[in-house]
Amino acid sequence: MRILSNVNLMGLLIVLLAAIFFCFHNVIVRILYSQQNILGIWQVGGFVTPTLSHSFLLLLLRMLWVVPLMALISQRLYGNTWREINQLKQPVNRPVIWEAMGCGFLMFLYLVLLYISISFIPTGIAITLFFTYPIFTALLAWRLFNDVPSLLRWLVIGLTLIGTFLTIPYAYGGEQQTLVLGVSTGIASGIVYAGYTVFAQRSFQRLHPVPFTWISFATTLILSILCLIIWQPHEGNLPWLAITIGSLLSALFTLAGHVLNNWGIHLIGASRAAIIGATNPALTVVLAGLAIQESLTNIQIFGVCLVTFSIALLNYEKVSPSTGKNSLK
């Protein structure tokens, strides 16, 4: 059995830490929407009600932190960030900036849908539904680029659909409408994110991921402002200090997750990092259970594990045929 090198092991741990940071962000969003029992000790949360305008508000406050912080560290992540952004002003590069801004719109849309989903259903379930996106990515790639799914990929799609079905909560009475909304927006966020990944991958051929990501964040910020002008929250007395702190923590965990994930990709490659990243639904369930005592049924836990296994298997298929090519230099 081959022993992992120090670089490989470090890369795996870094990507795993990035996934944990993303899980913290998901739990924080849940706390902002509904009161939770933190570590079984004290009650906190429920600062905003689960409405469309509040989703815009939370996304706006998050991006108000993320955009300037990303601008500060972007030069360290990629030395030509601002030079490439300035070059986008040239008429010949207009299609590139429009592509990046279009992906920014998709980022805005999938984040709003995911926020709505988390506000209505348990965090782990919302993230599991979101992580069905590789199914739609495979179907989009088949439709747009004639990338016919392999037999293994069809098997993964089937397992993911079964896991998703097992994960969906069922209730009766007044909760049914909110559950339907939470489940549908969770799946919809995955569909939109699939489109984002497909078009982003195409944009990376002409624009580096770091300036591309900053443009997407900035576009999301602008769209959040515009939507908040149209759909203003009706409540005039919100706990702004708590919301601001929660948004700052959300931004820091998000940004740290992105930076660590990119670092891990540099060490072990994107495909291997994606296999570790596929554990996000299971990690979110564990973290939500420990931090806010969020519980799922045994069938739902099995569904989460099945989706996690399926996505990891799909990512393994991508790395397996080219293991030799992707070996570290």
Curated annotation (Swiss-Prot):
A Pfam family found in this protein is: EamA
Q: Does the keyword Nucleotide-binding apply?
A: no
| GO cellular component, as recorded | membrane; plasma membrane
Q: Where are the transmembrane segments?
A: 9-29, 53-73, 105-125, 126-146, 154-174, 179-199, 210-230, 240-260, 273-293, 296-316
Give the way it sits in the membrane: Multi-pass membrane protein
Which residues are in the EamA domain?
103-169, 191-316
Ordered alphabetically, the record's keywords are: Cell membrane, Membrane, Repeat, Transmembrane, Transmembrane helix, Transport
Write down the InterPro entries for this protein, in alphabetical order: EamA_dom
Q: Record's SUPFAM superfamilies?
A: Multidrug resistance efflux transporter EmrE
Q: Where in the cell is it found?
A: Cell membrane
Q: Per the similarity annotation, which family is this?
A: Belongs to the EamA transporter family.
Protein name per the record = Uncharacterized transporter sll1319
Originating species: Synechocystis sp. (strain ATCC 27184 / PCC 6803 / Kazusa)
